[in-house]
């Protein structure tokens, strides 16, 4: 499956919104999505600059998350700018993966496999109060190290 199909499957399994034409989401969904992007960006910073120490993730939790605008209709919402920024983010992220030799599509498949293990004991999604999917009792971490090892070429380091 391509990345879009993986995410679509996740949304279907966890009963999250999917629209096939431009749609203005609720302020709560915008805040959740922007927060998730910032949270993952902070994880990237921790991995690049702090050997994965979670320093940036901690900064996100204590500072950046609280700086997001309150849940109200974003008056300045511009779907063209949002679409452009999302495309640019994906483009730049794939570019970074290429420069680092990271097989991003394979890593995404492994993360997707892990994400599908978040269901609760009853087979239903578990949500945080803001709508974020939480890890259930059968959750397992993605084995990204194995994916990278499987793609490692001897002598490349």
Can you annotate each of these PLM segments?
Residues 1-86, 90-157:
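Flexible "arm" and connector segments at domain edges
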């Amino acid at each position: 499956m391509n990345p879009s199909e993986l995410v679509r499957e996740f949304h279907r399994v966890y009963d999250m919104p999917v629209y096939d034409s431009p749609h203005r989401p609720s302020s709560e969904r915008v805040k959740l999505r922007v927060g998730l992007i910032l949270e993952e960006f902070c994880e990237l910073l921790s991995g690049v600059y702090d050997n994965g120490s979670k320093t940036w993730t901690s900064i996100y939790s204590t500072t950046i998350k609280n700086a997001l605008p309150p849940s109200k209709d974003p008056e300045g919402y511009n779907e063209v700018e949002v679409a452009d920024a999302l495309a640019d983010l994906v483009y730049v992220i794939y570019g970074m993966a290429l420069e680092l030799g990271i097989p991003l599509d394979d890593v995404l498949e492994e993360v997707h496999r892990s994400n599908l293990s978040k269901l609760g004991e009853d087979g239903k999604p578990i949500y945080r109060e803001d709508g974020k999917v939480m890890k259930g009792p059968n959750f397992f971490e993605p084995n990204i190290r194995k994916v990278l090892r499987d793609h490692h070429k001897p002598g490349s380091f």
